[in-house]
Structures are given as C-alpha cells and as structure tokens.
C-alpha cells in the first residue's frame, strides 16, 4: 500500500499524486462518488487502477490516503 494525495487540479479535475514514483494522473472514474460513500476503485488516465478504502462521507479535498494498486499502467 502506498500513501497518495487526492486533490483537484487547477482545471477542476480530480487527480491522484503518488510521491513514491513522482506520478500525478487524472482520475477518470471513481467507484463511489456520493455524499454518503466515497472511494473504492479509482481508474487513472494512464490505465492504472488503485483502491482506496471507502469513506462513509465525501471527504474535504485535498486528502492523503492509503491506496493499493490493483492494476499497473
């Protein structure tokens, strides 16, 4: 598992930053994106998929979380 930062870019797109690899990618899909549940699988623009344990409510961004890589780019 890796520590990642999830935030909005200046263009208003959701992005995931992985400091360990100095990688920042746009999040193209998120499994749960409701007010009462947020997280799950995050699909990145480069094809990689990460899993963030779902939160019981939508967090205030930016946020640092633990994420597990499910699929490499």
Predicted feature descriptions by range:
Residues 4, 39-40:
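Residue-level detector of beta-strand structural context in well-folded domains
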Residues 2-31:
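N-terminal acidic leader/helix
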Residues 1, 11, 37, 60-62:
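A general secondary-structure signal for short beta-strands and their flanking turns/coil
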Residues 18, 38-39:
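Long, low-complexity, intrinsically disordered terminal regions
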Residues 13, 36-38, 44:
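Intrinsically disordered, low-complexity regulatory regions of eukaryotic proteins
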Residues 23-25, 32-34, 44-49:
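Short amphipathic alpha-helical surface micro-motifs
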Residues 41-73:
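Short, compact, well-ordered microdomains
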Residues 22, 31-37, 54-59:
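A short, sequence-level motif marking secondary-structure junctions
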């Amino acid at each position: 598992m890796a520590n990642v930062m999830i935030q909005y870019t200046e263009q208003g797109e959701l992005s995931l930053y992985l400091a360990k690899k100095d990688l920042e990618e746009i999040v193209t899909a998120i499994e749960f994106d409701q007010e009462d549940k947020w997280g799950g699988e995050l699909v990145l623009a480069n094809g990689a998929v990460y899993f963030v344990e779902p939160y019981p409510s939508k967090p205030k961004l930016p946020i640092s979380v633990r994420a597990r890589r499910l699929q490499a780019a």
